[in-house]
UniProtKB/Swiss-Prot annotation:
Region called G3, residue ranges: 91-94
Modified residues (N6,N6-dimethyllysine): 3, 316
PANTHER family documented for this protein: TRANSLATION FACTOR (PTHR23115)
Protein's job: This protein promotes the GTP-dependent binding of aminoacyl-tRNA to the A-site of ribosomes during protein biosynthesis.
Binding-site residues for GTP, renumbered to this chain: 14-21, 91-95, 153-156
Ribosomal protein is among the record's keywords: no
Name of this chain's protein: Elongation factor 1-alpha
Organism superkingdom: Eukaryota
Domain tr-type G: 5-240
Organism: Schizophyllum commune
Main location: cytoplasm
Family to which this protein belongs: Belongs to the TRAFAC class translation factor GTPase superfamily. Classic translation factor GTPase family. EF-Tu/EF-1A subfamily.
Pfam families: GTP-eEF1A_C, GTP_EFTU, GTP_EFTU_D2
Gene (UniProt): TEF1
Length: 460
């Protein structure tokens, strides 16, 4: 066994028919954690249902269905390897909830793979003004996903045309530039997710294709395939040296064990013996044990989905959306209000002070009031365009003071990125995204401190 590979996370974005599932399925299938038996089982089922031509996407559909039914699916199924990395596919979107998931969940995305359908008409549909492609790319950029790979898919339907590929690269470059990406740092790969061209091996169908190049801090990087491009992702820096922040996804009551909050460590580490404070509930208690995938862990690090056992805390005290933090190291607090840079994506009317949509920030889902529009700014440069605007509309960016309707814990994006970005939901869709600039925290004394926390403090 060599040294464990570095983990990176990718999010696959693009229009619903761009072939994301097939492309992702193909990678997982060929370099992934799905064992041969499962593959054969899936293939047999797909063939019986006459879905033979759909096998890679079928693999993904099966995994999704199992994931949605809450079968704790072996997470290896969503992983594949490159020479350098162990890659986890966070979400292959195509659904309304994707945007929400992306904001609340992509703290972890190190790179976005934008899949674009090369077929005539398809590309245009995906990139049209209201296209999902645009929205996904804008989101990825706004949420700090700075690395991008563009996979121009379905090249087989263009008869492997070099002209079509070049045309798409040109259009897409203009498009991603508007979003904020620098096309020179992006690898453009012509592929067929279904036939496998330029996925792992160089395609013989496109002799004109000489490979991709991209600029990085270290210099120019070159490669041929999509796998090469993923392998050329710049390694992420994980925030384990920051204070602990762990937003709770759920809180379980487990007979014989007690209360077990579950969530992903976003920053810092969590380990047994630590005294944690939950905000905004303002409850402090000792962590008895930490586990992941039903195994005890010495410590949970950023990116780990963990369950941890806490004593003397009832399921009523803490809930989804609460944030666990180290009581001795910058403990999390309730936000009385916060200022954020908000980008309006798609709202049919105007938004003014008093607007009170639901914010999805990390795992919290709480209505917040736009108390004050402070200034309208240029989305790309951040320069002020207008002080105290009366209204903002789609396409605008502004600095807003927000006041939560219920106790909520958020942080500034600079200090704790995953807790500093949010989606604004209204009319069953994401109408805006935001990045938190500053938080006005309430200092509540007299929170509940459990006996086990007091004992742990005495031991120290």
């Amino acid at each position: 066994m060599g040294k464990e590979k570095l983990h990176v996370n990718v999010v696959v974005i693009g229009h619903v028919d761009s072939g994301k599932s097939t492309t992702t399925g193909h990678l997982i299938y060929k370099c992934g954690g799905i064992d041969k038996r499962t593959i054969e089982k899936f293939e047999k089922e797909a063939a019986e249902l006459g879905k033979g031509s759909f096998k890679y996407a079928w693999v993904l559909d099966k995994l999704k269905a199992e994931r949605e039914r809450g079968i704790t699916i072996d997470i290896a199924l969503w992983k594949f390897e490159t020479p350098k990395y162990m890659v986890t596919v966070i979400d292959a979107p195509g659904h309304r909830d994707f945007i929400k998931n992306m904001i609340t969940g992509t703290s972890q995305a190190d790179c976005a793979i934008l899949t674009i359908a090369g077929g005539t008409g398809e590309f245009e549909a995906g990139i049209s003004k209201d296209g999902q492609t645009r929205e996904h790319a804008l989101l990825a950029f706004t949420l700090g996903v700075r690395q991008l790979i563009v996979a121009v898919n379905k090249m087989d339907t263009t008869k492997w045309s070099e002209d079509r590929f070049n045309e798409i690269v040109k259009e897409t470059s203009t498009f991603i530039k508007k979003v904020g990406y620098n096309p020179k740092t992006v690898a453009f790969v012509p592929i067929s997710g279904w036939h496998g061209d330029n996925m792992l091996e160089e395609s013989t169908n496109m002799p004109w294709y000489k490979g991709w190049t991209k600029e990085t801090k270290a210099g120019v990087v070159k490669g041929k395939t999509l796998l090469d491009a993923i392998d050329a992702i710049e390694p992420p820096v994980r925030p384990s040296d920051k204070p602990l922040r762990l937003p709770l996804q759920d809180v379980y009551k487990i007979g014989g064990i007690g209360t077990v909050p579950v969530g992903r460590v976003e920053t810092g580490i969590i380990k047994a013996g630590m005294v944690v404070t939950f905000a905004p509930s303002n409850v402090t208690t000792e962590v008895k044990s930490v586990e992941m995938h039903h195994e005890q862990l010495a410590e949970g690090k950023p990116g780990d989905n963990v369950g941890f056992n806490v004593k003397n805390v009832s399921v009523k005290d803490i809930r989804r959306g609460n944030v666990a933090s180290d009581s001795k190291n910058d403990p999390a607090k309730e936000a009385a209000s916060f200022n954020a840079q908000v980008i309006v994506l798609n709202h049919p009317g105007q938004i003014g002070a008093g607007y009170a949509p639901v914010l999805d920030c990390h795992t919290a889902h709480i209505a917040c009031k736009f108390a004050e529009l402070l200034e309208k700014i240029d989305r790309r440069t951040g320069k002020s365009l207008e002080a105290s605007p009366k209204f903002v509309k789609s396409g605008d960016a502004c600095i807003v003071k927000l006041v939560p309707s219920k106790p909520m814990c958020v942080e500034s994006y600079n200090e704790y990125p995953p807790l500093g970005r949010f989606a604004v939901r209204d009319m069953r869709q994401t109408v805006a995204v935001g990045i938190i600039k500053s938080v006005d925290k309430t200092d509540k004394s007299g929170g509940k401190v459990t006996k086990s926390a007091e004992k742990a403090a005495k031991k120290k």
